């Protein structure tokens, strides 16, 4: 665990923070909260010695002389702001910035300190006689001769220090269509557009190799910000400041404790596209623009997560208007869901509309972090209606500042991180661009007329006759045309925080408040864990369930950007570990059977019977409920998580807990060291059984008995090795019950692919006939006797290579002689005529909606060669329609 950085003494910390300031021109280096007095001043240049710059300020009844020298020592080598110009090559913008920064003293006092930027006016801060002062330009130009606001903050240290990253470390969504244009007498109209490949997202869960589970850890979302040519043309020299301000607003939203995690947005690189031919292809098709941008941004990312320029997600900002269904052009952003650690898909596209784009950015980044819309079926099923005032509301109306994140958003994010799908966020960046921390409405970039131009276009400005109730709460804008109607958007379009709204008053969260109240220092409070809650309900009534206890980060709750709690947020223990009464069904099988009553039918209208599917399931998906139609290859994922306490697989004792495989013993206790011995006895010493092994002697054509394995046998392993260079040597394993029913490769129908064989709750795993080592395995006690056979097809002679082993309880009467005697009575005669030989059905060609399944149907003669003498009228079908789950609209 990396320790949190110790707090250094004031002077070096102030120097570092204030030197970072000019990247966000006009923003104070520390939160603008609590200024005591301010005056407008015009800096004047004084003669200075060689290599020194002297500036004079007059305010508060006295003069200030700043003697400054160049100082860019705080800029890390990794610092990157790049531009794509006419050459198509990225050129660094930091070289010019390095000449912006100066530090020095005030009025010759050795204990004073000044740190400022001289690019685009004078921005920065200084300390003198125990008081702190900040200065920033009030105009849009870059001259020193323009008015600047000098603000006095009282004793140094009276304002809260900015919160840096927490270094302490303890793992196709739809487009967002939030706003529609309105005239003042129009009704609010909006529709939600689904992007390409959109679907209702399942909770992002799966098994993981991480050892830490249900732990709150600091996460760092390393971000590439890209502004296209339309942004560069619209904002000009203010572009960098604008996009960093958007990110600053979004970062504050992600610091709110309602997100239930420690999320830090970090900008590692800004890329400004000055020539559109070198940028991503942007059009009014939001989905297509996203695909183009995702492909384009990959060239700038470093593959190693440890590289200082590596980023976890890329965001494109554009002035392009996106149009969707029925020609509606009110889509504001688009992103794929749950792609945060996928370098090919972790990206989003944002339509810039001034400061409002910060909320769109936060929303689309939420999709990338796996959050669905608040009105999606999974959210409403779990939490009910959640209103329209959270970040992930499908339509942006007004953000609930006290609870910006819905419980559903917090849950999906937590499951993404606890499931190990956000491990790329665990590393803190080596260097990140500082974000503005002041009130944006204080800057010339966001004066009222500028806010109107950014949202509606260059010909708009603020309506002068705004009603008293709309001051700060609703931005109305108009043009100077023949009919100067006032326009607005959404149910709520508040003025930028910090916008002057009257003498001595500023806007704050849609209200006009006294300036001293808006800028009053807000104490920063780190969060603390509340006591552990009671143990919850056990997930099972027998066989080893799991119960949870949780604790919340609300003692105290983080306030004003304070750190969210780090450490374990949930703990679990085993419960009801007694064995279940034997019923011949596994717990996973019972979960699949629940869907037998649903309207899933075959071509003849018969209800399908569902059994667990293990074969072909990736290790990370073992805790999803995969079920296969009995006797068919069709399968479905019915649940994103099996019930806690379900075995991860037939060959392991590990159990699923919240979608993750965790270690457990044969006594059904989590983290227990107890294991099954070779006899299948929990904690046994392996002395209650004996080993049986053997091999097959030369056989006749047809089905030949190898061995009949008695009930109670464990650790069964039957192997048939193909001859080198021969894919089909004419020998295949088969399996049948005591009453003669075939479970595997019977009636000359060979299973080429891996499959599971379910026998009264016990699974036998079959490798498939195409495997070089054809294998049949089972690890748990066999519930009934089974006969293993070898099918030998006439043709080129390849002697079989079959070996088998298993363990039989000492009290079971079994001898190899009796097995061999039985084997001699079950020899099948050679095939006498050509027959149709069937392969297994393929998977459905479509993951949703209608598709097709295919299989091989071949006519083979008694020698196994292709033949044309089979009865074509009796040829089985080789294709059939299949239907997976309905495709989302």
From Swiss-Prot:
Keywords: Cleavage on pair of basic residues, Disulfide bond, Extracellular matrix, Glycoprotein, Heparin-binding, Hydrolase, Metal-binding, Metalloprotease, Protease, Repeat, Secreted, Signal, Zinc, Zymogen. Highly expressed in adult and fetal lung, lower expression in brain, placenta, heart, stomach and fetal brain and kidney. The active site is at 364. Glycans are attached at residues 344, 400, 465, 490, 599. SMART domains: ACR, TSP1. Residues 173-183 have a biased composition (Basic and acidic residues). One of its GO terms (cellular component) is extracellular region. Residues 219-429 form the Peptidase M12B domain. It is an enzyme of class 3 (hydrolase). Residues 526-581, 833-888 form the TSP type-1 domain. Gene3D superfamilies: 2.60.120.830, 3.40.1620.60, Collagenase (Catalytic Domain), Thrombospondin type-1 (TSP1) repeat. The precursor is cleaved by a furin endopeptidase. Glycosylated. Can be O-fucosylated by POFUT2 on a serine or a threonine residue found within the consensus sequence C1-X(2)-(S/T)-C2-G of the TSP type-1 repeat domains where C1 and C2 are the first and second cysteine residue of the repeat, respectively. Fucosylated repeats can then be further glycosylated by the addition of a beta-1,3-glucose residue by the glucosyltransferase, B3GALTL. Fucosylation mediates the efficient secretion of ADAMTS family members. It is found in: Secreted, Extracellular space, Extracellular matrix. Residues 138-210 are annotated as: Disordered. Disulfide bonds join 294-347, 323-329, 341-424, 379-408, 452-477, 463-486, 472-507, 501-512, 538-575, 542-580, 553-565. Its EC number is 3.4.24.-. Residues 690-831 are annotated as: Spacer. InterPro entries: ADAM_Cys-rich, ADAMTS/ADAMTS-like, ADAMTS_ADAMTS-like, ADAMTS_CR_2, ADAMTS_CR_3, ADAMTS_spacer1, MetalloPept_cat_dom_sf, Pept_M12B_ADAM-TS8. Zn(2+) binds at residues 363, 367, 373. Residues 184-197 have a biased composition (Acidic residues). PANTHER family: A DISINTEGRIN AND METALLOPROTEINASE WITH THROMBOSPONDIN MOTIFS 8, ADAMTS A DISINTEGRIN AND METALLOPROTEASE WITH THROMBOSPONDIN MOTIFS PROTEASE. The spacer domain and the TSP type-1 domains are important for a tight interaction with the extracellular matrix. Has anti-angiogenic properties. This is A disintegrin and metalloproteinase with thrombospondin motifs 8. It comes from Homo sapiens.
